[in-house]
């Protein structure tokens, strides 16, 4: 890339930085005063004219200054080479705060609250999806001789409980056998594969009286409730930050709040995160969701030992501190995975 192109990118970078900081359109005079660009105000004006003609910046109808466009933000993000990692003190503070969580729910609640505070945006964390989780432990408890409670604990720390209504009563010996059979079929396997194995057991024991019926009914509950109808859950924090940035969204704040409440759009974007440690930035129309078109989303996946548990990230205005937000999202995701993987 030629010298003029490099210089224009430095001008664009300065416009983005100043607009994010001030929320005021940026003129050539202020760029000369605030940044050591090494050229005259006239040269900067010419560079700004080229950037505007190419669609990287635009002029608000009431101002002589310029603001970045979605294309300008995208160019800025694509050429980031100075995403400064959080300091050791900050990282230790994050790790210690998350490690203090007593269980999965508490860890994720802490994570979403922390991320909202770090970025001053709306933070979202997807609960670990059962379909990608492995079973760490399974327990079967007799509530009555004809009613069981099946408890599944995944490697991400998620606990799910399901009631199994039996067609007949089973005794303590059969209950022990059932627990052993289900444990052999499930533990260490992803739920989709484990449920198929349980169903195979059910077929093999179809003529075994009460035990075969119990295995079959348990398999049905596990298959239908834990695999085919996986409940997608989303934790959210910092929605008040949207109100603080209301001017950034024009008249679209209501539709953004409605999209967050419905969760479907956000879950779809988080579900696309399949690689822990890789941060994705979607700017404006890149979200492909009309309800949140005035926003940007910075997201990644979290997990442990090459297993992705779920997605997480932040949602805010396109006028966002992208380097700081990217660093915060990456750090919190890393430590969520480490904390959950160690349990």
Swiss-Prot record:
Keyword annotations: Repressor, Stress response, Transcription, Transcription regulation
Entry's Gene Ontology BP terms: negative regulation of DNA-templated transcription
Pfam families reported for this sequence: HrcA (PF01628)
Signal peptide coordinates: none
Chain segments annotated as transmembrane: none
Superkingdom to which the source organism belongs: Bacteria
SUPFAM superfamilies: GAF domain-like (SSF55781), Winged helix' DNA-binding domain (SSF46785)
MF terms (GO), sorted A to Z: DNA binding
Entry function: Negative regulator of class I heat shock genes (grpE-dnaK-dnaJ and groELS operons). Prevents heat-shock induction of these operons.
PANTHER family cross-referenced by the UniProt entry: HEAT-INDUCIBLE TRANSCRIPTION REPRESSOR HRCA
Family: Belongs to the HrcA family.
Name of the protein described by the UniProt record: Heat-inducible transcription repressor HrcA
Originating organism: Mycobacterium ulcerans (strain Agy99)
This protein's encoding gene: hrcA
């Amino acid at each position: 890339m030629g010298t003029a192109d490099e210089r224009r990118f430095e001008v664009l970078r300065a416009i983005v930085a100043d607009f994010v900081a001030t929320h005021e359109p940026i003129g050539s005079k202020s760029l000369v005063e605030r940044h050591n660009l090494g050229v005259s105000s006239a040269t900067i004006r010419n560079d700004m004219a080229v950037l505007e003609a190419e669609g990287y910046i635009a002029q608000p109808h009431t101002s002589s200054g310029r603001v970045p466009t979605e294309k300008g933000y995208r160019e800025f993000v694509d050429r980031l080479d100075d995403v400064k990692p959080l300091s050791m003190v900050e990282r230790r503070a994050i790790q210690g705060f998350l490690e203090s969580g007593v269980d999965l729910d508490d860890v994720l609640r802490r994570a979403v609250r922390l991320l909202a505070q770090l970025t001053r945006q709306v933070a979202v964390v997807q609960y670990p999806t059962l379909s990608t989780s492995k079973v760490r432990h399974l327990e079967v408890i007799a509530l009555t001789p004809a009613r069981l409670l099946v408890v599944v604990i995944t490697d991400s720390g998620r606990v799910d409980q399901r009631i199994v209504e039996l067609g007949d009563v089973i005794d303590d010996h059969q209950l022990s056998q059932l627990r052993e059979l289900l444990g052999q079929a499930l533990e260490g396997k992803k739920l989709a594969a484990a449920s198929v194995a349980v169903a195979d057991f059910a077929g093999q024991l179809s003529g075994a009286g009460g035990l075969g019926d119990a295995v079959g009914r348990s398999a049905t509950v596990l298959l239908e409730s834990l695999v085919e109808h996986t409940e997608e859950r989303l934790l959210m924090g910092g929605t008040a930050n949207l109100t603080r940035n209301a001017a950034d969204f024009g008249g679209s704040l209501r539709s953004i709040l409605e999209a967050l409440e419905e969760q479907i759009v956000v879950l779809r974007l988080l579900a696309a995160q399949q690689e822990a440690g890789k941060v994705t930035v979607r700017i404006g129309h890149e979200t492909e969701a009309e309800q949140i078109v005035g926003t940007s989303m910075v997201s990644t996946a979290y997990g442990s030992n090459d297993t992705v548990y779920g997605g997480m990230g932040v949602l805010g205005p396109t006028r966002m501190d992208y380097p700081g937000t990217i660093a915060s999202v990456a750090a919190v995701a890393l430590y969520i995975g480490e904390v959950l993987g160690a349990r």
